[in-house]
Amino acid sequence: MPANRFNGFTEYGVGIGLRIPHYRHILTKKPIVDWFEIISENYMIDGGRPLEVLDKILDQYKVVQHGVSMYFGSASDPDPEHLRRLKQLVKRTNTPWLSDHLCWGSVDGRYTHDLLPMPYT
């Protein structure tokens, strides 16, 4: 198959996860990497060190977002506030794509904070 079978996906190269223990190294050493993956929910906040670091990273790198709490498989609709903050973060990062898990993890507004498998029904 040709390398472009993913409609440009491969043009983004190789990325690594942006995690708190790596902040200092990344900001001081400026490693050669194509992009960083952020966990969306860690940056869906109103200020603070994570957003300060994210803005510095965005000055030099592309960022892609990966979520861990959309719970597409739950019976409830997605939380409108979560979607609002997610949209706000997408605009801030100008991410080329956003991913999340196909799972469930909430019932009646109560969250398990786990990625539970979809039932085989």
Kindly give the residue locations of the regions a language model identified.
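Boundary/entry segment of secreted carbohydrate-active catalytic domains
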Residues: P2-I26
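Active-site mouth loops of central-metabolism enzymes
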Residues: E11-I20, M70-D77, L115-T121
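Hydrophobic faces of well-ordered beta-strands that scaffold small-molecule active sites
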Residues: Y12-L18, D34-I38, V63-H66, P96-D100
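Active-site-proximal loop/turn and secondary-structure-junction residues that shape catalytic pockets
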Residues: I20-H22, S40-N42, S69-Y71, L102-S106
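Acidic (Asp/Glu)-rich catalytic clusters
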Residues: H25-P31, G48-Q65, E81-P96
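Acidic-and-aromatic substrate-binding clefts and catalytic sites of carbohydrate-active enzymes
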Residues: S40-E52, Y71-P80
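Structured, acidic catalytic/metal-binding patches in enzyme active sites
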Residues: Q60, G67-P78, L102
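Active-site acidic/histidine proton-transfer and metal-coordination neighborhood
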Residues: E81-T121
